[in-house]
Amino acid sequence: VTDFDHQDRPAGAWFVRSPVAYALILLFGLALYLPGLRGIPAVDRDESRFAQATRQMRETGDYVDIRLQDEARLKKPIGIYWLQAAATSLAGGEDTANPIWTYRLPSLLGALGAILMTLAIGRRWLGAEAGFAGAAMLAATLLLGMEARQAKTDAFLLLAVVAAMAGLAEAWMPPPGAAPLPRWLWISFWAAIGVGILVKGPIVLMVAGLAAIVLTVSDRRFSWLNRLRPWPGILIALAIALPWLIAITISSHGAFITQSLGGDMVAKLAGAKESHGAPPGAYLAMFPVIFWPGSLFALLALPWVWRNRRDRAVILCLAWIIPSWLAFEAVPTKLPHYVLPLYPAIALLAGAALSDRLNTLPSAGGWRPWGARAVIVLWVLVGLALGAVVIAAAPLGDGRPSVRGTLAAFAIWAVTAGGAWLAWRGERRQAAGLVLAGSVVALGLTFGMAIPALDAPWIAPRLKETLFQKMPAGHGPVLIAGYAEPSALIAFGTDARFGSGADAARLLGDDGNAVAIVGGDQADAFKAALDEAHTTAEPLGTVAGFNYAKGKRIVLTLYRRAP
């Protein structure tokens, strides 16, 4: 195994070598993630569930028990709820125009922190240019862009994983006999483990642990692990994660352990959960899409990675990627964001291949010409498909084409065409620069303009707007029948209830100021129950939309009791 000092790596331009690089990557991330952060309504289902549970914590003052209305939500640890509650409080509370966005702030900060940490790891062990290119590539990744805009766990988990892997790298990369790690560094490693556990359970342990096993086998020595001070370090991780675990176990009478481990984790390991099953290899098949636009450069980097497989920095990245990737592929339940914690290492390898001055075309960086061209063609097809999806989604609802969606699609296609043309000519660095800069425009138009402008998917905000227009002075309790998505709770509040058409009719009979929202297969039951109770309902308006969580169109009508 060879060991190259990071100072020997290609350095790149002056701004890449200087601390200015961190400011540039931060600004790049903000330019990518801010569009749409406030404009996209609450997304079903996970984001809305997380945010609603956090809202209820703030309403009740109970920051131990996790609930979605009256139902205990014990599948995930508490960390992200605390972060969302703190962010919303610091932001001055919810925004009445779009309540969800303050709950997204921890995801934004997690994504920004992850790309900055990726830059730091790359600069330290692969060189300034590789670190900069890798961090920019990770930032522009389609999957991270989606997670940075959603009030979920995955973007902040990514930060915890990257921080832990930075500590692991500092312990393993130096040769035997190196000076002990500074106290702050090994404490940071174990703190990242503890925070990662508190955010999403054992994922951070799996990624760091499997990487540590591979690195130990690679070096045939265990002594490097002592540099992480495992015994006091484990106590630090436990001090972060254990108090809440004990509190919720007592509060739930052990239900958290049985539901999170037995009901959630074991179910995912044993079989496909919630119709999210896929065979092994699914993540590999998804990679060209969800790592876009960087997937072009990651795939073209494969020969470079093979040639440099004995480089310690490359071994570190491969240990980060391969064992956990195989583990994720082996689990029947598959969702695209599961492999996000491995993407920083992929981005760093792609950045290192780009920065290698000896790795130029026409040799295609080690690919035979037909192989490199096949990769470029695949990448072009993905770009064309992404633009087509934006255009196909644009007219959802009224059938009219969307100018914003069309602009976003053409921006994606322009980035695809320009990047492919330069890559085909062998100018990979120029292609990367164009693609990454162009992604700010293309993804900004997509997330900042095209998606918020859609009508059909955003059913709950339109219901809320219709009700306000008809009853601006206020209304009584709201019951929704035929549409049970949690985004409705974000729109109408914790007191809104889901039920049957008969429940909706009874509510109108009991409360003259109540509102019933009825649609789907509950309309007939609602009308039958009204007739039986001799109650007359007055329609306030109708909202037609597309329930993307179920993949079907729906029509909902708002009612109040007729005077």
Predicted regions and their residues:
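Membrane-embedded architecture of ER/inner-membrane glycosylation machinery
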Residues: 2-10, 187-191, 269, 304-563
